[in-house]
């Protein structure tokens, strides 16, 4: 019967992988000293009477390490896109050039870099908590299965060990992603 429970573990592993992926998406929105199109992924624009993501009304490119270009397809939303970028908490000031926005990426101050590292740490900690909650859910489900005599006590212990290994792997991925992002942020 243990083989019937194996998919349960893969389901929890998938959830943990999604938590790590979510962290990487959060990190993409954190500004570093270099330009990245991912920096603008979270920006929502008030266009056509509703809030839409920036990439649905424009194409984003990075021609230089310290500049982002936004090519807006409809002239009518240029001011809305500019306003959305300016009002974001990224501290960017776009320059309008017809249908294009040129966004210079100013170098970060040492203080701002340290703040960004703290924010990245908070993101990472939130995902670690999410991973641990998934582990708790998995262990609870395994204990319920053991109580219902679906799996034996030995299988329970074996599967709990496997869940812990999966959890350790996910936590390690979070730590590695955080370390990489910290290095990226602190790089001058």
Curated annotation (Swiss-Prot):
InterPro entries: Ribosome_recyc_fac, Ribosome_recyc_fac_dom, RRF_sf. GO terms for cellular component: cytosol. Keywords: Cytoplasm, Protein biosynthesis. SUPFAM superfamilies: Ribosome recycling factor, RRF. GO terms for biological process: cytoplasmic translational termination. GO terms for molecular function: ribosomal large subunit binding. Its main location: cytoplasm. Coiled coil: none annotated. Belongs to the RRF family. HAMAP family: RRF. Responsible for the release of ribosomes from messenger RNA at the termination of protein biosynthesis. May increase the efficiency of translation by recycling ribosomes from one round of translation to another. This is Ribosome-recycling factor. It comes from Caulobacter sp. (strain K31). The lineage of its organism: Bacteria, Pseudomonadati, Pseudomonadota, Alphaproteobacteria, Caulobacterales.
